Amino acid sequence: FLEHITYGEPNRLEGFLFPDTYDFYVNDDPDRVLEKLLSNFNRKFSDDASAQLETLNTALAERWTAKGYDESYIEAHRMTIYDLVTVASMIEKETASAKESSTIASVIYNRLCDPANYPYLNVDATIVYALGGIDGALTYEDTQIDSPYNTYNRTGLPAGPISNPGLSSISAALNRADTSYYY
């Protein structure tokens, strides 16, 4: 599942270090720790989730086709596991409520499927990530930060995951609510 990640990117494992309870030994080898975290993600992202990702791609392709986008556009925008984890990570940081997660996923996908009218995702959590955290509310100036994670001035998904999402956020990213919400 790491095939879409460029080696050497400083945040390349963000999103794949599954939040869970782990047992480690004092002075455990860092490579062993990473292997355990990544293996757990791989176990949690089951074959069923891979099938759900294909179903999601089919649904998104149908929406893009209905909006007049051609096959090359659709193929270039197929969701990978990396993309899915990126969406799930935004959901994870946008809400603490599992009940709202699938609606937030719907807003993200609705915007991704209508880039002519909604070129930017405008996800506040990506700005907070790009800034390294904030005290207080976001400002207009915050949304203008030059960062590949800024979804206020860059189209499509941010450069990568902004957190390590849990199962409920991954599930929401795979099973979005059926809404017409863009906000």
Q: Residues of each region from the PLM?
A:
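Bacterial extracytoplasmic/cell-wall-associated proteins, especially those involved in peptidoglycan
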Residues: L2-Y183
